[in-house]
Amino acid sequence: MISHLSHQNTKASTGHLLALFTILIWGTTFVSTKVLLIEITPVEILFFRFLIGYLVLLLIYPRSLRIASFREEWLFIGAGICGVTLYFLIENVALVYTTASNVGVIVSIAPFFTAVLAHFFLDGEKLTHRFIIGFGIALSGIILIALNGSFILQLNPLGDLLAFIAPAVWAIYSVLMRKIGELRYHTIGATRKVFFYGLIFMLPALFLFEFNWDLGRFTNLANLSNILYLGLGASALCFVTWNRAVNLLGAIKTSVYIYLVPVITVVSSALILQERITWVIILGAFLTLLGSYISERKR
């Protein structure tokens, strides 16, 4: 009994560390993306980062993943479409039609969508009152960070609607990855397969959006280092660690760490881009951390 509890605690601790590590990286991707956007379009960044991620995972785990049934194959297809193609494309298109603040706040409700879907479609994952209270507190903090003292409400129906769809799509991805995790496939191999389908379904978008195959832009050290950071770190490494965390903690507990992304983004922007941190941002960060703590606490 004691040995079983110790094993469970070790699994939980590992899951929390992996989720925190992932979010620390993902929270800084905004800075890299901002640098790349000077010369490279959003869809180009998206394609190249996941292509690099896929090739790295293929190099690390070249073995073919033998899927037991076509039903299981559909789980990988769905995860690739939702977690790689649709989520990032919808988020980028939303930014064209609405403000970055609106998108930042709306996308941060992903843990709530994930909790609702997990409650209905995953065994042993239930939506609790504590989670809802924590969600409300964290969301208020995220709103403060996004607005940063400029309390001007700007509604852009199309862009805001797309921004709402993005976290719903991420929630579907989280649930699908939890189901894939239950099948006991190798985490790196499973993530690589998800990337493969994500890239396949991304191809039509290359014709719909402006896409330039010119690789000469990556001879620029800033462009090269940042696309490698996104491809190696934020994609290849972090999707593996995130998917492993989902397997260990469950979709709901892991998703709570998404609340921390705006906080990490603000801190990294201040350190690297010299952007100013105000008392409103500090209060927002405190509320976000408090909300995530309440959501994670056991009864």
Model-predicted regions and their roles:
Residues 56-66, 110-133, 263-282:
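C-terminal transmembrane-helix exit sites in multi-pass transporters
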Residues 31, 57, 114-116, 121, ...:
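Transmembrane alpha-helical segments that form core, pore/gating elements
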Residues 11-15, 39-43, 47, 68-74, ...:
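Juxtamembrane helix-entry segments on the extracytoplasmic side of multipass membrane proteins
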Residues 57, 77, 117, 129-149, ...:
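Hydrophobic transmembrane alpha-helices of multi-pass small-molecule transport proteins
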Residues 2-44, 81, 153-179, 201:
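Glycine-/small-residue-enriched transmembrane alpha-helix faces in small-molecule transporters
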Residues 46-48, 103-109, 176-200, 231-271:
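Helix-helix packing/entry segments at the starts of transmembrane helices
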Residues 2-8, 12, 17, 48-51, ...:
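C-terminal-most transmembrane helix of multi-pass membrane proteins
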Residues 25, 29-30, 58-107, 117, ...:
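Specific transmembrane alpha-helical segments of multi-pass solute transporters/efflux pumps
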